[in-house]
């Protein structure tokens, strides 16, 4: 609804698109700087490193408009324009099962209907506001522990680019700085088939408008421009969390947000957490530096059971993390990374990207997350779900040597220095991926992907005395076809093969067909 005008787009706006590499962004900004305003969207074909498929991905989100000298920012003008041109949207979702599920016969306290309501207001890319309400299937509505109606409510207000005030969030918001080793509530794409998607950009402050009941902060956050190349961010959050309290201490944190049964409802909002911190960043031409620090504490001590694989997990009452992130671009090379410390341990992630020729990228990533690094809100690249107890080397290559074709290959070698769930000793593994994508038309595309993974796991029934390698082979073919705005079709064929040493293999097949209005 509000495409980005490329003639005035900033680096931060372009970095929101995961399919754009740092080099492509650099060449796009340089093209406009050298040649002046674009007259038509088709000029994207003249930008160095901009391939056909990337342009196709970009077209729905951008536009070309002539610009004049903009007047200085005025709050009165912003509010007046927002009242006149702002857009309102109301969305609701109902999920009604056509059969009686087992859990609703005795266990769950509410009906099997899921319902969410989202109201949002938006003006340009400067003002966002909204309210979210949600009731999961099985949760009561307007009764018992939900006497005020829904089980979850969320409010957010976000202002952006208001003079020196680059961002202001009130209510629920999300944060991401550096490579995510200190704090990141962004959704990562994982080991995807686009090398450009691994470019963790400093996302800063964002609104929280989803129904995720755990992965957000509640309070206030702001980013201010101190000088031309300097920004400073500060934030504070105070919110209740779900969990289990035993003898006055928190023994587990409950992250699902489900309160369907009495047992789940008894865990709701049992303790509070406060968090404060900040970030200072410097960016000039090809260099970017930043420092991020956070401090958070619970109103009760957090004392989970620390045995076996969880021996070095987070515990205590108050915690901190401090990290330095850095990035530098030189010709066809791009280097970025972050190194962080906590109350225990340290972590570091560094990546080097090289584009030897147009439409080809090579990515190298090294990460080291010590087994005793505590970072409750960190979220970064890795095989595991946390930035703890992992180290590895990753290499990926993406190239488009022919028209309509794109090839991707990657290999990841990783290890876990300490025990993990269902692995009673230090372990290691590998992960390889090959993919070929063919896009002959804008409405027709297909790909073939093969993935191989080897990981170690305790054999069932061995009580941790026998650890065997598990081999996974996955093959997928997918065809996407659309008839304009009328119909979109997706056909997927999946084959999975899994086996361990001297054990029988598990084999599975699946055919999926999805038809939806365009």
What residue spans do the PLM features occupy?
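Compositionally biased linear targeting/interaction segments
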Residues: 1-141, 145-158, 163, 172-176
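Short loop/turn motifs that connect adjacent beta-strands in outer-membrane beta-barrel proteins
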Residues: 80-87, 126, 162-168, 177, ...
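Outer-membrane beta-barrel proteins
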Residues: 134-152, 206-213, 266-269, 340-342, ...
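Outer membrane beta-barrel
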Residues: 147-242, 359-376
